[in-house]
Regions:
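Loop-to-helix element that buttresses phosphate recognition and phosphoryl-transfer chemistry
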Residues: 1-13, 73-83, 127
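Phosphate-coordination/substrate-recognition cap region in phosphate-metabolizing enzymes
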Residues: 1-55, 114
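Residues at the C-termini of beta-strands that transition into short coil/loop
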Residues: 26-28, 58, 125-128
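Active-site rim elements
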Residues: 29-33, 68-76, 111-112
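Acidic, low-complexity terminal tails and accessory targeting/binding regions
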Residues: 32-51, 93, 108-189
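Short glycine/proline- and acidic residue-enriched helix-loop micro-motifs
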Residues: 53-74
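Glycine-rich phosphate-binding loop signature in dinucleotide/nucleotide-binding domains
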Residues: 90-96
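Generic beta-sheet signal
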Residues: 96-102
Length: 189
């Protein structure tokens, strides 16, 4: 979370000066449980970043490995669920524009299916979904197909690909009943 807060404070300072608040949210953290992808304690972050609102951060953060932290585990199911939850939460906000500063791996494999170069951005609109309990589809603006800086790979990946499935057979040995939770139009479900 520290890296994303630093990025937000540096790149969005002009909005912060106008009173836009920064809201920390544990759902948008990076995927793995490696030290480089596991956050610092909220108390440490509060002391370092007084301008950030941490009131909604899940108290279990930064735990990703205990039973309490299972919803943040480095598994396909956990990552896709927090992506769905995060996108659904955005849909429920009253603001017309929400900026998410997150991590490339999580955004690519859990949320958008698109690559992000360091410091790059993409712009998406939420298309309403008429199916109950389904999050909206993400529709990327054509101007950011290679990232807003033009440095990101334009070729999408399948959401959820390369994410670990506990107790799954090794790649190439999956049975036909093993399926994934995505559609070709990158709708999260």
């Amino acid at each position: 979370m520290r890296r994303t807060i630093q990025t937000a404070l540096l790149s969005l300072d002009w909005l912060i000066e106008k009173g836009v608040r920064i809201q920390a949210d544990a759902r948008w953290q990076e995927n793995s449980a490696k030290p480089c992808d596991t956050g610092s304690s909220v108390d440490d972050l509060k002391a370092e970043f007084a301008k950030v609102d941490f009131s909604a951060v899940d108290p279990v953060y930064p735990d990703k490995t205990s039973p309490r932290g299972a919803k943040y585990a480095f598994t396909k199911e956990a990552i896709l669920e927090r992506a769905r939850s995060g996108v659904q939460d955005i849909r429920e906000h009253k603001e017309k524009l929400i900026l998410v500063v997150s991590h490339s791996g999580f955004l690519r494999l859990g949320v958008t299916g698109h690559w992000f170069f360091n410091g790059d951005y993409r712009v998406f609109e939420l298309d309403e979904c008429n199916e109950p309990d389904q999050p909206p589809k993400l529709k990327q603006l054509e101007a950011t197909l290679s990232g807003g800086l033009g440095k990101s790979w334009p070729d999408p990946v399948v959401i959820g690909s390369d994410l670990p499935i506990p107790d799954a057979p090794p790649r190439g040995k999956r049975h036909s009943q093993d399926t994934t939770s995505f559609t070709s139009d990158n709708r999260l479900f």
